[in-house]
Amino acid sequence: MRLTRSLALLSACTLAAASTQQPLTDSDGHPKPDPPPYEFPLKFDNPRTDCKYVSQPWIADIFKNIANDFADVFKYVAPDVTFRIMGHHPFAGAYSNPKIAYINSLHRLNNCLKDNEVDSKLWAIHGGCDSEWTIMELYFNATTKRGLPWELTSLWVSRWDEDKLLREVRTYVDAGQIMRTLWDNEIWWNSSDRVTHYDIMPGPGGLPPGINASLEVDLSEELQEL
């Protein structure tokens, strides 16, 4: 008898909790992305600008539109940068050239999204100023070409020099989200952070506008000199 009452009480509590929860899907039945945990605009825990390396406000200005204008970030990448996308997923690996990293990852991902449009926000910046190391938390939001809501969180662990150039980058992303996005929108392949990438693999969408096939030859010659 007590067990029956306990089960009835548990069922009633479960139904009451479910009735107060916000719906997890939109009107079309698509899952809703979780809201960003940070407030905008970005608040700096160290707003100083008289820094030995890079200041947090300076980083925010450079990375404010990384999803749609990665070329602006390229200007602050050292030619011999060590760039590694961590994990075990299609984008993972070591890249000796940041352009290859961009084409094989962000550009390829953009080709899976509606109108190639991505809303990117810098959630938080940690470190920097008199420390050569920084951590940037980035949030990306878009709609896939299949019409599904899409979001991705990325973490950049970066080392800068006194000339404000990126010398080392380790970036962490949601591997499951990347694999689902590519699986749903193109032919899927895999990789790991133990692989060194020397070839351009932008995916079925091809190269970014303004970059032609000669880039492959130029990059090959450049890599042979390393």
Swiss-Prot record:
<comment type="similarity">
    <text>Belongs to the dimerizing cyclase tstC family.</text>
</comment>
<keyword id="KW-0325">Glycoprotein</keyword>
<feature type="glycosylation site" description="N-linked (GlcNAc...) asparagine">
    <location>
        <position position="190"/>
    </location>
</feature>
<comment type="function">
    <text>Dimerizing cyclase; part of the gene cluster that mediates the biosynthesis of the antihypercholesterolemic agents phomoidrides which are dimeric anhydrides. Within the pathway, phiC produces the bicyclo[4.3.1]deca-1,6-diene core of phomoidrides via the dimerization of the monomeric anhydrides leading to prephomoidride. The pathway begins with the highly reducing polyketide synthase phiA that catalyzes the formation of a C12-fatty acyl-ACP, starting from one acetate and 5 malonate units. The hydrolase phiM is involved in the release of the C12-fatty acyl chain from phiA.</text>
</comment>
<dbReference type="GO" id="GO:0016853">
    <property type="term" value="F:isomerase activity"/>
</dbReference>
<feature type="region of interest" description="Disordered">
    <location>
        <begin position="20"/>
        <end position="39"/>
    </location>
</feature>
<keyword id="KW-0732">Signal</keyword>
<feature type="glycosylation site" description="N-linked (GlcNAc...) asparagine">
    <location>
        <position position="141"/>
    </location>
</feature>
<keyword id="KW-0413">Isomerase</keyword>
<feature type="glycosylation site" description="N-linked (GlcNAc...) asparagine">
    <location>
        <position position="212"/>
    </location>
</feature>
<feature type="signal peptide">
    <location>
        <begin position="1"/>
        <end position="18"/>
    </location>
</feature>
<comment type="pathway">
    <text>Secondary metabolite biosynthesis.</text>
</comment>
<dbReference type="InterPro" id="IPR032710">
    <property type="entry name" value="NTF2-like_dom_sf"/>
</dbReference>
<protein>
    <recommendedName>
        <fullName>Dimerizing cyclase phiC</fullName>
        <ecNumber>5.-.-.-</ecNumber>
    </recommendedName>
</protein>
